[in-house]
Amino acid sequence: MGLCSDPAITYLKRLGYNVVRLPREGIQPLHLLGQQRGTVEYLGSLEKLITQPPSEPPAITRDQAAAGINGQKTENLSFSIGINILKSVLAQFGAGAGIEAQYNQARKVRFEFSNVLADSVEPLAVGQFLKMAEVDADNPVLKQYVLGNGRLYVITQVIKSNEFTVAAEKSGGGSIQLDVPEIQKVVGGKLKVEASVSSQSTVTYKGEKQLVFGFKCFEIGVKNGEITLFASQPGAIAMALDAAGGVMPSDSALLDEGGLLDLEGF
């Protein structure tokens, strides 16, 4: 959805991550997404598709350090796009009303996420769980997204952060002077606001919530009459986990080739 040349987005996509346009809580491994007619919708947890689970769901490993993603920056975004992302992020912390007035001199905005953590589940474990489980064949989600015209995906990893830095520029690249104490008043006590030592136009926001800004997912489909997990190259299914639980390639599915992904239903 635009911004496809942005190096940060391209970098995350190259690692197999879908980049969430409006970072938020609530996106977790083992949650399902349905894609139909260009829209991606949140559908709920994988367990709701299972009538008789063979065992406990695959274990989720939480709060792993994501050093390879930490500190990645977007390129300069237009003010209208950048300020909407900032307002959405701040709203997740219960703050941000009126923040656009503090950036009224800005024409470009750039984001950087720090303290990035990952929650993940092993795709092979998910595939094995699906193979052994009894799936609800009458579930409308299965009929619509697996047997119908849609596509069904299960999230296997999310990347999240509670700290992000916003750099603002005037038209032509000049810096602006941001009033950090005033910004702190606007966001209240739910976020800590700090100015960069090197630039008054760069501000870091830090809160307690971990907001998800990217995720990996694999497609759920049917092979030889059985529900199974597929690994997808961007835009096409590459291969499936075989009945013996063989090796699965690492390529996860990219749901939007254009850039940032909008999720419906959260």
Curated annotation (Swiss-Prot):
Post-translational modification: Palmitoylation helps stabilize the inactive state; may self palmitoylate. Palmitoylation plays a significant role in pore formation.
Alphabetic keyword roster: Antiviral defense, Cell inner membrane, Cell membrane, Cytoplasm, Lipoprotein, Membrane, Palmitate, Transmembrane, Transmembrane beta strand
GO biological process: defense response to virus
Disulfide topology: none
Any one GO cellular component localisation term in the record: plasma membrane
S-palmitoyl cysteine lipid attachment residues: 4
Region (C-terminal region): 238-266
Annotated consequence of substituting residue 111 to A: Pore-forming domain still toxic in E.coli
Regions that span the bilayer: 69-85, 97-114, 163-180, 189-205
Effect of residue 77 to A: Pore-forming domain still toxic in E.coli
Domain of life the protein comes from: Bacteria
Similarity comment: Belongs to the bacterial gasdermin family.
Domain notes: The N-terminus has marked structural similarity to the mammalian gasdermin N-terminal domain. The C-terminal region wraps around the twisted beta sheet core, probably stabilizing the inactive state. The beta-stranded transmembrane 'fingers' of the active protein form by local refolding of several alpha helices found only in the inactive state. Reorientation of the N-terminus probably flips the palmitoyl moiety for insertion into the membrane.
Record's protein name: Gasdermin bGSDM
Organism annotation: Vitiosangium sp. (strain GDMCC 1.1324)
